[in-house]
Amino acid sequence: YYGTYGKHVGDGMLYYFLKDRENRYLINAISCALEICENIKNLNMEWKTRKGWFRELYLNIGINEGKEYFGTIPSAPSIEFTALGDTVNYAGRLSDFARNGAIWITKNLFNKLTAEEKAGIRYGIRHKDKDRETLVENTFSRIIDMTGLNDMTASKFKDISTLAITEVVGWR
């Protein structure tokens, strides 16, 4: 998918999908995320069957689009690639917001996809009632509207509280 591994603080992973005339970098990032989630689901099933492991592995994913400043960090035995700025920070905060292996993208990213690419993605916001959850397809929400003003988690995401996002759940 033409992603480039980048240096990331903490226990997460970071990949950059760089804009190029020849590739569809945004859809590549989404495709990569969906394939990773599918592989993790398969790994979970295999471990349950083969090893009797009943814990679930999850990789929460946040994807954003924007312009950043790139650089390298020399470290033995190689050089590490890094970028700083709001785009990277928002993607990291989205992965913090995600739960149970979800993929969250910003409306900013979605709006830069072609009409054909948008039509191929299944996305939306999950609405929770008392005992069930429903995906309201083709919708976006601000983080603050999903966490509530008085929720303790709302303060954790204050810096991205007004960011419009949606959950990518698969292909159509």
Summary of predicted features, one role per range:
Residues 1-28, 42-86:
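Catalytic core of nucleotidyl cyclases, primarily class III adenylyl/guanylyl cyclases
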Residues 36:
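Serine endopeptidase catalytic core focused on the charge-relay Asp
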Residues 39, 43-46, 76, 90, ...:
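Conserved, well-folded catalytic cores of nucleic-acid-processing
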Residues 39, 55-56, 89, 120-121:
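Alpha-helix boundary/capping detector
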Residues 64-65, 86-108:
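Catalytic/regulatory signature loops of cyclic-dinucleotide turnover enzymes
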Residues 70, 77-80, 90-91, 112, ...:
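A broad, structure-centric signal for solvent-exposed, well-ordered loop/edge residues
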Residues 100-172:
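Intrinsically disordered, glycine/charged-rich C-terminal tails and inter-domain linkers
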